[in-house]
Amino acid sequence: MIAAQAKLVYQLNKYYSERCQARKGAIAKTIREVCKVVSDVLKEVEVQEPRFISSLTEIDARFEGLEVVAPTEFEVVLYLNQMGVFNFVDDGSLPGCAVLKLSDGRKRSMSLWVEFITASGYLSARKIRSRFQTLVAQAVDKCSYRDVVKMIADTSEVKLRIRERYIVQITPAFKCTGIWPRSAAQWPLPHIPWPGPNRVAEVKAEGFNLLSKECYSLTGKQSSAESDAWVVHFAEAENRLLLGGCRGKCLSVLKTLRDRHLELPGQPLNNYHMKTLLLYECEKHPRETDWDEACLGDRLNGILLQLISCLQCRRCPHYFLPNLDLFQGKPHSALESAAKQTWRLAREILTNPKSLDKL
C-alpha cells in the first residue's frame, strides 16, 4: 500500500515538474503579452475618464488583479476608488451578490460616482459597466495595439480578443477590507479545526471584492433592477487559505488535468471548481501533516472523487457562500459527460500511476 502510494507521489511530482511547469511557463509568457495590450487600452481609458485608473501593476513577477481563467482566457480586475459613501448590503436575497446603498444622510453629490446612483440610492454595477464598456471601445480604436485587439460584442461584459487567440475580461470592482459579508457568516464552521484562528483573522481582514459582472444566480434576469447588484468575490482570501503544504502543487496538477482532459462541450468545469473542491478537501483533512508531500496522491484522489460526486448531484456549492451553486445554468448532459470523463481519469491515475506520463 505504502509502495503504491509512493509510486503515485513520484509520478505526480514528475507530472508537476514536466506538464504543470510547462503550463505555468506558457501562461506566464501569455500574461506578459496580454498585459502590455490591456495596460495600453486602460491608459487610453484613463485619459478619457480619470475615475477609471488602471490598477494593473506587476508585483514580484505577478500582476495584481489578474486571474487566469484558462490558458488563453484571463480576467483583469480594475479597482475603483471611493466606495466610502456607500453601505454594503448583503441580505441573502441574491446568492453571490450584494448591493451598495448610499449611506443615510449622505448626499449623492458627495460620491465620485454620482451619475451611476439609481433613484433608490443604489450604486448600479450595470451602469458603471456600461459606461466603462463605451470608454474601452473608444480606447481600443485609439491605442497603439489597435491592429491586434478587438472588443467582443453581444455581451454586457467588457471583453477583449487579443491577436485572435486570447480573451481578456476587464471587470470594474471595489475592494472591501476589514468587513466580512453576512452571507459568509457561517464560515469557518465551528466544528472544523481548519483553518486556525490566526489564519481566519488574516482572511477576514483581507476581505473581498465586489465585481461589476453578470452573476451566476441572475442569469436570465439581467434586465431587472437586480442587475444593479455586485458579485461578491473572494480570490485573495482563497489564495491565502491555500498557502502551505502541497496545496499549491495539488491545485496546479488539478488545473493541468482539467485543461488537458476536462475541457468539454458546454464548458461544465473551470479552474474555479477545482479551487473550490481543494478548499473543501482542506476542511476534510485539517491537520498540516495531511498536506505533506507524501499525501499528494491521497489528496488528489479525494478531490477527484468529490468532483465526480458533485457532477452526479449537479451541485457544487461555493466555498464561502454555500447557497450559491457553481453548476447553476450548466447543461445536465455536459455535467454527466464531465462525471464520466473525471471517473475515467481518476481510475486511470489510481490504478496505473505511470499513465500520468501520457496524460
Swiss-Prot record:
UniProt-listed GO biological process terms: eye development
Pfam families: Mab-21 (PF03281), Mab-21_C (PF20266)
Annotated compartments: Nucleus; Cytoplasm
The UniProt record lists the keyword Nucleus: yes
Chief localisation class: nucleus
The UniProt record lists the keyword Cytoplasm: yes
Gene Ontology terms: cellular component: cytoplasm; nucleus
Keywords for this protein: Cytoplasm, Developmental protein, Nucleus
Family: Belongs to the mab-21 family.
Function comment: Required for several aspects of embryonic development including normal development of the eye.
PANTHER family in alphabetical order: CELL FATE DETERMINING PROTEIN MAB21-RELATED, PROTEIN MAB-21-LIKE 2
Protein name listed in UniProt: Protein mab-21-like 2-B
Organism (species): Xenopus laevis (African clawed frog)
